[in-house]
Amino acid sequence: MRVIIQRVKGSSVRVNGEIVGQISRGLNLLVGIGNNDTESELDWMTRKCLELRLFPAEEGGDRWEKSVQEIQGELLVISQFTLYGDCRKGRRPSFSDSASPSIAKTLYDQFVAQLKDSGLKVETGIFGAMMQVTIDNDGPVTLLLER
């Protein structure tokens, strides 16, 4: 499982020109599910996303001392199978390391449900849809989590 985690001042996702998910201050999570991933990765990834200290204790501060939970931030979760694109050969990425859509959707939905259990506002895109994502990256702070 791979998650690109981005600290944002705001983020939104559109499908067919319509906003389907939108947040203010918090985290944008681009989520890729690999073909070897199981439910065992979900708890660790959920904890990391919710507990990583990526926010300053005070506005304008430079030390990251608070998590998204501690600031009562918001989460925008977007499915992103292309995180498993392999570009080592040829000119076209191979996605053979990505989980099948049915398995990926099940694990993605479980991940979103675990994040929602935190009580934070959680918005999502539409799994498998072509989406336009607008990200107001704060910092910029962008990290890759992999399990």
Curated annotation (Swiss-Prot):
Homodimer. It holds the Pfam family Tyr_Deacylase. PANTHER family: D-AMINOACYL-TRNA DEACYLASE 1, D-TYROSYL-TRNA TYR DEACYLASE. Keywords: Cytoplasm, Hydrolase, RNA-binding, tRNA-binding. It is found in: Cytoplasm. An aminoacyl-tRNA editing enzyme that deacylates mischarged D-aminoacyl-tRNAs. Also deacylates mischarged glycyl-tRNA(Ala), protecting cells against glycine mischarging by AlaRS. Acts via tRNA-based rather than protein-based catalysis; rejects L-amino acids rather than detecting D-amino acids in the active site. By recycling D-aminoacyl-tRNA to D-amino acids and free tRNA molecules, this enzyme counteracts the toxicity associated with the formation of D-aminoacyl-tRNA entities in vivo and helps enforce protein L-homochirality. GO terms for biological process: D-amino acid catabolic process. Its EC number is 3.1.1.96. The keyword Hydrolase applies. GO terms for molecular function: D-tyrosyl-tRNA(Tyr) deacylase activity; Gly-tRNA(Ala) deacylase activity; Ser(Gly)-tRNA(Ala) hydrolase activity; tRNA binding. Belongs to the DTD family. GO terms for cellular component: cytoplasm. Its main location: cytoplasm. A Gly-cisPro motif from one monomer fits into the active site of the other monomer to allow specific chiral rejection of L-amino acids. It comes from the Bacteria. InterPro entries: Daa-tRNA_deacyls_DTD, DTD-like_sf. It catalyses: glycyl-tRNA(Ala) + H2O = tRNA(Ala) + glycine + H(+); a D-aminoacyl-tRNA + H2O = a tRNA + a D-alpha-amino acid + H(+). This is D-aminoacyl-tRNA deacylase. A motif (Gly-cisPro motif, important for rejection of L-amino acids) lies at residues 139-140.
